[in-house]
């Protein structure tokens, strides 16, 4: 059984790549065809590679790995935060601060500052300070929470990065590569797949597509933590004899563009 069916991928628009003029030639093996100037991703390969990514995430989770979900563009921001939290993991969904991984010790000092400010807000310290100072401290707390709130409880460097759009998150991927932290990523037709360890060829600009893939990666982590007998409901889908072939999908796409 596959983790995600071809039909689910199609309905979420996972097959739509970028304009052909924006492609990265290294993605050629994951492209099925071109329709009206748009590359169409080979969903038969995506189905298999989602399975591989799911197994990788599940196995790492079983081994106790910590995961950092990264996706800062608006199409990914909500799904990244919600699915990481559902899996009990960590996330960055607004802006990647350079050095988050490679200068972790400095980042930890900013996280501690955030925690200190939160404690001050809760223990009544703010009530004893001048209002102007409290306003400034609250602004600082809000800014730190925006960028670091998703990793404030991360015990150390993550063991695995899950990334939506490694082209957009180039700095995060480079830092992970430098530290030999494996990267699992949704990768569109405009990006270089060679910087990613576990590839999921997919439309990384559609909210539904991002949500679908990200949720399955969260399912994998949950299953790994709980064990095979407690796999998330509907984590796997039965093979659908009526699922469209990739040729039929291409025709559907072409008809939809006419």
UniProtKB/Swiss-Prot annotation:
Q: Which domain of life is it from?
A: Bacteria
UniProt keyword Transport, yes or no: no
Annotated GO biological processes are:
translation
The keyword Oxidoreductase is annotated on this UniProt entry: no
Supply the alphabetized keyword list. Answer: Ribonucleoprotein, Ribosomal protein
Give the matching InterPro entries: Ribosomal_uS2, Ribosomal_uS2_bac/mit/plastid, Ribosomal_uS2_CS, Ribosomal_uS2_flav_dom_sf
Q: What GO molecular function annotations does the UniProt record carry, in alphabetical order? A: structural constituent of ribosome
SUPFAM superfamilies, alphabetized: Ribosomal protein S2
- For this UniProt entry, what's an example GO CC term? cytosolic small ribosomal subunit
Task: Report the sequence similarity comment from the record.
Answer: Belongs to the universal ribosomal protein uS2 family.
Q: How is this protein named in the record?
A: Small ribosomal subunit protein uS2
Gene assigned in the entry:
rpsB
